[in-house]
Structures are given as C-alpha cells and as structure tokens.
Design a protein with these regions (language model features):
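Short glycine/serine/threonine-rich phosphate/pyrophosphate-binding segments
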Residues: 24-25, 137, 153-155, 195, ...
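Glycine/serine-rich phosphate-binding loop and adjoining beta1-alpha1 elements at the start
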Residues: 81-264
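Glycine-rich phosphate/diphosphate-binding loop of Rossmann-like nucleotide-binding domains
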Residues: 153, 158-178, 230, 236, ...
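ADP-ribose/adenylate-binding Rossmann-like module
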Residues: 210-213, 337-391
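Adenosine-phosphate binding glycine-rich loop
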Residues: 233, 237-238, 257-263, 363-412
Length: 412
C-alpha cells in the first residue's frame, strides 16, 4: 500500500538549540529524515557563543508522525528542543481574518463625515432610495458566508463552532482571489425554517449570500426559498461552485483523453448537495450516461428509499437502471467523480474502468483514492486538495462568481 506523503497541512516548526560544533546540524537533519520527516525550511542561525539557535519547518504525514519526529529530535545528543508547534493550528490562532477601515479619521472633519452629524445625510438618502445601500455601505462588496455546520467538508455534522475555521478560510479566499469582503456567520439552526428566517433578517447588511456546508436535503429547500424571497444573489457553493469546477475540469480532461462528452459514462459517488448539482450540470453539458451512488449503492428509478432530490436524480439519470455497489457500476465507466468520503474506491476499481479513465476524487480532507494509489492507472487524476496537482475545488470559482455578481448589482 502506498505511503501517505508528508504535507504542509501537518507541518511543524521545531525550535532547536544546538551545540556549536561540526556535525550537530547534520545529525539533526539526518534524524528528522530517518523519522520520515521532510524538511521544508531552515530559518537563519542565531549564534550565541557555544550554541546555535534555529527553527526548522518539517512536513509530516499526520499527528502521530509529528510526535515521532519530535521524539527523534528530543533524543539527539547536543540538541535541545526548546519548543515545537503545529503550523496549521498556529495559523488559526485568534482566527484568520480581521476588520480593517477604508476611511481615514485623522481630524474632526473626518469624524463629522464618517459619523454624526454627516452620516445622517447618507442614512436619509438610503431611506428615500434603498438601492443606494449598495453604493454607500459595505453591501457593495460584502458577502455573508452562512453555515449551520451540518455537512462540513467530509467531516459531517460537527456543529457551528467547529465549522468556523472553514468559513474563516472561505472569507480569506474571497478577499485574496476576488477582492470580496466575506464574513463568516455560523448559526445554531437545524431546520430549513430556522436558517431561512435568519438569513432573511440578515440580508439587508450584505450584497450576497453564500450558503456553505448545510446538509442535504435541507440545503436544496433553503436555497430555493431564499432565492425566491431575496433580491440579492444566493449561492450554495457546495452545489454550484463544485459543479462549475467539475465541469471545467472534465472539459479539459477530454482534451487530454480525446473522449467526447456525449460518449461518456460517468459514475458519481455521493448524492448530497455536491453530487446532485454535479449530475445536473453534466446532464446540461450533454454527458451520455450518468450513474449516481449513495451509501446504499446505485441510484435508479424504482428504488424505494430515495428522498426528493435523489428521486429526481433517479428519474433523470441511469437510463439502463444499473444496480449494485460503487464497484459494480464503475465497470467500464469513463469517469469517476467522488464527492463522498475517504478510501471509497481501490486500484482494482480503476483497472475495471474504460481505457484512459478520468478520476476526480474530490472528498475533503481525504480523497476517495489517493493519487499514489492511482499512479499509472488513470489518464487524469485530480483531487479536491490544494497540496496535490490537479486540484478541483470550488475556490477556483466562487471568488470570481461573486466578484462579478457584486460588480453588476445582480439580484439573482
């Protein structure tokens, strides 16, 4: 079985004090390597007489591997491990975003325009013409990132507090890649009625609503109701952002493999928000055959345990009524699209696919099959992770989509 590679997501920083004698640094580097760590960076030396002080960044495989590297360093003669920390957790301390001002307040004139009395004039202008709120307030460039934490990445229903790091990351990416001010709002709301009511009350503050990590089937109802009731764009990124980047990746993959959209047989693993939306966009793109699978197996017309979203999927896909497990329906398929969970498929499944198979294993944080396991078996191999080549992630779509929507004051 392929060894899980080291990654920045599990990297650590080692703050070390070394005896200032030849060979000490070499022994330290060797110990890290023998423990399976991959040195990512060496900070500059701080020479203090008979001692050297430096920080070393080491990429590890997982948290257990982090501890193995730490213990290897601690056991070295002539090296003292002063401190160490997980770089991912360190990045998240106190959050990843903060609020900045865009207007100066250098004197009384500035203050009188930014706040009272001058602000009252702007308030009344908006009162007389509410559309001016998109010009004279943060609505012009601000999106609410709303989640109830019921379907976070591949982690599941982990709650609103635990969803916050993802939503903060989303806000960071909105700003970095689209210049959009996104604000994370994680709410303690379980039902569709609660989420809809909250967002409707919140809407006057924002120029758009990005729904995120809300479980199916509630997410479908929530988006439909909000689109009908609000006059600003409402976008469920798990559905449409993922669908957009999947179709883009498939178009490019066809250029490599020489296959045609209308001839494809596509298997989609995962019938939540993303899987259903991907199916819909592939239907519109003209894909020849689509078979969806959930935990029970293939989705087909006549299956008795389907919710409304899956029922629609059954009626509009899988014309041959293929049945069985994910492995069964992957026989002869051209494309595998995974939006489910880790380790779902094997190398044997890829061998059973059609010639030059296209594999999109997009489960996060861990894919349905790792690229190392698919090496030499797939014509195109992609994941949803940013530390592998060929990333298919909605971060490639949502900043630009909202940038455009805000710029034209879109209402849908």
């Amino acid at each position: 079985m392929a060894t899980t590679p080291t990654a920045a997501a599990f990297s650590i920083t080692l703050d070390c004090r070394l005896d200032n004698v030849p060979g000490t640094l070499g022994r330290l580097a060797l110990a890290i390597g023998e423990a399976g760590g991959n040195i990512g960076a060496l900070d500059g030396f701080d020479v203090r007489g008979p001692e050297l002080r430096r920080c070393i960044v080491v990429h590890c495989r997982d948290e257990a591997h982090q501890q193995k590297v730490v213990e290897a360093v601690r056991s070295l003669k002539g090296v003292t491990l002063v401190d160490w920390w997980d770089r991912t957790f360190r990045m998240h301390e106190a959050g990843k975003i903060h609020v900045l001002t865009s207007a100066p307040v250098n004197d009384r004139d500035d203050l009188s325009m930014a706040y009272t009395p001058g602000v009252a004039r702007v308030c009344m202008a908006i009162h007389n013409d509410p559309s001016l709120s998109h010009r004279y307030t943060i609505r012009k460039n601000t999106v609410a990132i709303v989640s109830n934490g019921t379907a976070v990445l591949g982690l599941g229903d982990i709650g609103p507090e635990a969803a916050m790091p993802v939503m903060e990351g989303k806000a960071l990416l909105f700003k970095e890649f689209g210049g959009v001010d996104g604000f994370p709002i994680c709410i303690n709301a379980r039902t569709a009625d609660e989420v809809v009511d909250f967002v409707e009350r919140l809407a006057p503050t924002f120029g758009g609503i990005n729904l995120e990590d809300i479980k199916a089937p509630e997410c479908f109802e929530i988006e439909e109701r909000l689109k009908a009731s609000l006059d600003i764009p409402v976008f469920h990124d798990d559905q449409h952002g993922t669908a957009v980047v999947t179709l883009a990746a498939l178009w490019n993959s066809l250029k490599i493999t020489g296959k045609k959209m209308e001839d494809l047989s596509v298997v989609i693993a995962g019938m939540g928000a993303a899987g259903v939306a991907i199916g819909k966009i592939l239907i519109n793109a003209g894909v020849g055959e689509i078979v969806g699978c959930d935990r029970t197996g293939a989705i087909y017309a006549g299956r008795s345990d389907l919710n409304a979203a899956k029922q629609w999927f059954a009626e509009n896909t899988n014309p041959s009524r293929k049945m069985g497990s994910i492995s069964d329906v992957m026989h002869g398929a051209d494309v595998f699209v995974g939006v489910s969970g880790p380790g779902l498929i094997t190398a044997a499944d890829l061998r059973n696919m059609a010639k030059a198979p296209i594999v999109f294993a997009m489960a996060n944080p861990d894919p349905e099959i790792r690229p190392e396991q698919a090496d030499g078996l797939a014509a195109v191999m992609a994941t949803g992770r940013s530390d592998y080549p060929n990333q298919i992630n909605n971060v490639l779509a949502f900043p630009g989509l909202f940038r455009g929507a805000l710029d034209v004051n879109a209402t849908d």
